[in-house]
């Protein structure tokens, strides 16, 4: 003989009310066979709703046992009970409990989503059920666009979506007018005729008369159990053993959770935007700071490169600001010649400079006249705008050939080409053979005018001195600059007998600037990250509020079969989505800041790196997961009975 469909034995249900315990059900024993139509009648507070919650696996007895087709529910966990509700029970609530953001067909589909049904299959079935119940022209209407009777029919269709072997109707006519109530009871009788087990919970004896069996409960005790007809013979169609598996279309769960998250966000647009604001500001700050740091670093390094790549400058004296450096005359051309023979040296250019008056026609300007070697322009990264540079022969012959910069050209030759023209440096006539492209110094734009001559010409024909103002050494690319610098210092100390000079290693400067910029970027980014954390706390706060506001929705979802993991997933996806949208808007804001920065005359461009953008998205996701987990977990742990009772 097969077991009864539903069997409660020795059931007690006790609740804690302050310091006292309130026993709502007392030693309830009840058996319901498959195919019965049962009415449980009782006054308010009699325990009938608590009994229905236990029958529908929304609650568990405090003491006693509840068997479904012979399976003891006391050993089942929350997800196993959810599967029973999902696949074998259908609920019809007095207040309908439809999800306000979903259409009629969307509400009916919800149980099938959690059952893992394919999208097309569940849509077809939902449409079929609604059409069968006379709502074929209301498929896309939301609950607030439907009458009370129509909303109740939607809840009936939802109860039938996954089969609804057992239909639990809680005061099904309580919120309906008499005509709609009559139609609802006739509909329940039709479902009973189709083989569904119907359990009606009501306080109205007139409603109970539609059932074949009336159970009266008072003060938690069943006081009568009357059958109007014989119990139907139960068919051997056992309830599926609980294995907590997903049947098909598991990916649809994520898609539906994503859709519900979008719906929740669009319903509260302003609140969602304000929640995102902390994330937007934090992400925009981090990305902008990194872009500013990268842009400024690249600008500075480009300026340093203008001093020469992999170069070491040698100057007389004991360091910058040394007043005695002008009296040090030991740096000579032979030092430069000696440095050329070092194996790690690529090229050497001596430097002599002097401030002098330059004349052309009736125009006179004060310029810095630089005596340099032919390698100077390559070492310093100068490029020709017109003309040519001189060569070794010019140095050997003390050639009176000059290269001028663009500022000199603009001063003396604003409308004509200077190539081939003769100018006077002091009293020495020189011919202009080249003009360099405009170039900024490492410290920004310079107003000084520059003319370059062979160092032999400046030393021998103009200033008449046999010592140098400096030497620039270009190293081979494969040589560590610090080691080469020490070798140069050692050689010159041996030649001079004293270290009466100092060196400027451009690579060392570059490395120091890179370290400093990285440190500053990290420091400012750390400050910006604080706003991200504040934004994350804001997300958590709003999500906690959202869970409180949507408690009844969570209860409905649990009643139709949502597992704890389904609820957790939905709220977690919502939190992550809020943060990802905030991250996207933050990155867009960072780019907008870059455009404004460029338009307002910034001295360099903000450079956005793919790494920082990817990191921003990763950070947004992480914040969503970290700060969204607590609200999502709270939602998943709600008791379905308490959640449904919450207004």
Swiss-Prot record:
GO terms for cellular component: plasma membrane. Its main location: membrane. Residues 6-244 form the ABC transporter domain. Its EC number is 7.6.2.-. It holds the Pfam family FtsX. It is found in: Cell inner membrane. GO terms for molecular function: ATP binding; ATP hydrolysis activity; transmembrane transporter activity. It is a multi-pass membrane protein. One of its GO terms (biological process) is response to antibiotic. Signal peptide: none annotated. The keyword Thylakoid does not apply. The chain crosses the membrane at residues 273-293, 522-542, 577-597, 612-632. CDD domains: ABC_MJ0796_LolCDE_FtsE (cd03255). Keywords: Antibiotic resistance, ATP-binding, Cell inner membrane, Cell membrane, Membrane, Nucleotide-binding, Translocase, Transmembrane, Transmembrane helix, Transport. It is an enzyme of class 7 (translocase). ATP binds at residues 42-49. Part of the tripartite efflux system MacAB-TolC. MacB is a non-canonical ABC transporter that contains transmembrane domains (TMD), which form a pore in the inner membrane, and an ATP-binding domain (NBD), which is responsible for energy generation. Confers resistance against macrolides. PANTHER family: MACROLIDE EXPORT ATP-BINDING_PERMEASE PROTEIN MACB, MEMBRANE COMPONENT OF TRANSPORTER-RELATED. Homodimer. Part of the tripartite efflux system MacAB-TolC, which is composed of an inner membrane transporter, MacB, a periplasmic membrane fusion protein, MacA, and an outer membrane component, TolC. The complex forms a large protein conduit and can translocate molecules across both the inner and outer membranes. Interacts with MacA. Belongs to the ABC transporter superfamily. Macrolide exporter (TC 3.A.1.122) family. This is Macrolide export ATP-binding/permease protein MacB.
